[in-house]
């Protein structure tokens, strides 16, 4: 009797619920993302016969091959030795970091910022997620310009929002000549038509990943005025703010009081100090009430950000301002691009000359890959650029990112011949990459 009861109870328990109760967002989308596919391909390629004995050169994901500046490392080491700095910080950020950010940005915004204008976050991505979570109700729409940083999409959708895509139109003859970021343009009439009664926000990224475009004052003014007209919040992703190679860098929040009141600006210590693993970012706004919603969401997402690294960033910002570090970094990156793009000039492969960021898009239309080249099934189901990337990893030992991942399926043809390379590497590493890419001559 007892055994029969146990058997019946067990059967009841095993059939009343599924084995795993998971969020449908993650169970319905089982396809591997570009980062997983590229990293797995690189790991396998490292062991193939052609790459044995030579280093795989990874210019794919935007992580640095070198350490943060010595002054930042010293500040992190000092912070770890202070007992209370290893405990929770205030949810909106350590006062020391907030004060350093006020010191950094007040001259830029031409006003004396206050603590209520700043929220520290656990990286810029969490800052964007906090902005969206603080703003969106189910069904609200967010306009995203295409191509986009892929993390924007799940951030919006996990907050119950709907993504509306507006293209950044590529220049003509992209496959025939070198172009500039300024030649990639937004049709602002199309942008305004995309706004509906459900539109809550727009995300603008400048300098832009992956294009390398720095939006002009005129473009941002047009965008900002349309947002003011329709009361649309602007989330300005400015994580590459110190990496612009144009004469100036325009921040949309500074263009008018009305635009500033609708803008949330996101920044990153990881990008500023070659320390992407530190996971320290921030959100700024001249509208303290608007920012407060992002701050409340941040509190619920992670409560507080890493205290020792906040302290390190606070002091590193002060150090950087004293020694002109950010300008020096800009000049270093101008040289890095000069080193790296020289091979494409030599080979005659067109690219979009970056106006900012540490990325460059290169057109591989002229590269002749054997038609019978073997690809894994998961690559065959992707865009042409995934096949080019897979071939480049396996044959030349160079890793790049296929940028159709930054487009929706219907529009990915615009990038099917492109690859994105990251130059956030030391100069010797880039020189090795150039030597390796010279092997492309055999395929032109």
From Swiss-Prot:
Reported cofactor(s): pyridoxal 5'-phosphate
Catalytic reaction equation(s): L-kynurenine + 2-oxoglutarate = kynurenate + L-glutamate + H2O
InterPro entries for this protein: Aminotransferase_I/II_large, Kynurenine-oxoglutarate_AT, NHTrfase_class1_PyrdxlP-BS, PyrdxlP-dep_Trfase, PyrdxlP-dep_Trfase_major, PyrdxlP-dep_Trfase_small
One Pfam family named in its UniProt record: Aminotran_1_2
Modified residues (N6-(pyridoxal phosphate)lysine): 271
Keywords: Aminotransferase, Cytoplasm, Mitochondrion, Pyridoxal phosphate, Transferase
GO biological process: kynurenic acid biosynthetic process; L-kynurenine catabolic process
Quaternary structure note: Homodimer.
Descriptive protein name: Probable kynurenine--oxoglutarate transaminase BNA3
Organism: Saccharomyces cerevisiae (strain ATCC 204508 / S288c) (Baker's yeast)
């Amino acid at each position: 009797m007892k055994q029969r009861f146990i058997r019946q109870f067990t059967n009841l328990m095993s059939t009343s619920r599924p084995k795993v109760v998971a969020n449908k967002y993650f169970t319905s989308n089982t396809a591997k993302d570009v980062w997983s596919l590229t990293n797995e391909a690189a790991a396998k390629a490292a062991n193939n016969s052609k790459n044995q004995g030579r280093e795989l050169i990874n210019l794919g994901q935007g992580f640095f091959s070198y350490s943060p500046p010595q002054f930042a490392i010293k500040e992190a080491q000092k912070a770890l030795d202070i007992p209370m700095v290893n405990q929770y910080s205030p949810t909106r950020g350590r006062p020391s970091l907030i004060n350093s950010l006020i010191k950094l940005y007040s001259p830029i915004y031409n006003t004396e910022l206050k603590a209520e204008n700043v929220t520290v976050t656990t990286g810029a991505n969490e800052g964007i997620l906090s902005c969206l979570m603080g703003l969106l109700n189910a069904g609200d729409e967010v306009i995203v310009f295409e191509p986009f940083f892929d993390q924007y999409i799940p951030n919006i959708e996990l907050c119950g929002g709907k993504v509306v895509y507006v293209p950044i139109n590529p220049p003509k003859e992209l496959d025939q000549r070198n172009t500039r970021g300024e030649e990639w343009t937004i049709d602002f009439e199309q942008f305004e038509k995309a706004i509906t009664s459900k539109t809550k926000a727009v995300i603008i990224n400048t300098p832009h990943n992956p294009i390398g475009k720095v939006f002009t004052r005129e473009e941002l003014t047009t965008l900002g005025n349309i947002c003011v007209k329709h009361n649309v919040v602007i989330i300005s992703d400015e994580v590459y703010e110190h990496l612009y190679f144009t004469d100036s860098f325009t921040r949309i929040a500074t263009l008018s009081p009305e635009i500033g009141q609708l803008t949330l600006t996101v920044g990153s210590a990881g990008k500023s100090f070659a320390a992407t693993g530190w996971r320290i970012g921030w959100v700024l706004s001249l509208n303290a009430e608007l920012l407060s919603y992002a701050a409340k969401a941040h509190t619920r997402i992670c409560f507080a950000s890493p205290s020792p690294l906040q302290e390190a960033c606070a002091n590193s910002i002060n150090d950087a301002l004293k020694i002109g570090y950010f300008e020096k970094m800009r000049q270093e990156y101008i040289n890095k691009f000069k080193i790296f793009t020289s091979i494409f000039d030599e080979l005659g492969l067109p690219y979009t000359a970056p106006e900012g960021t540490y990325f460059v898009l290169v057109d591989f239309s002229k590269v002749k890959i054997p038609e019978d080249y073997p690809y894994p099934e998961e690559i065959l189901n992707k865009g042409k650029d995934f096949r080019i990337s897979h071939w480049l990893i396996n044959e030349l030992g160079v890793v790049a990112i296929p940028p159709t991942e930054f487009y929706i399926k219907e529009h990915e043809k615009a990038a099917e011949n492109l690859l994105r390379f990251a130059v956030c590497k030391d100069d010797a590493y880039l020189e090795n990459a150039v030597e390796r890419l010279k092997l492309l001559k055999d395929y032109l």
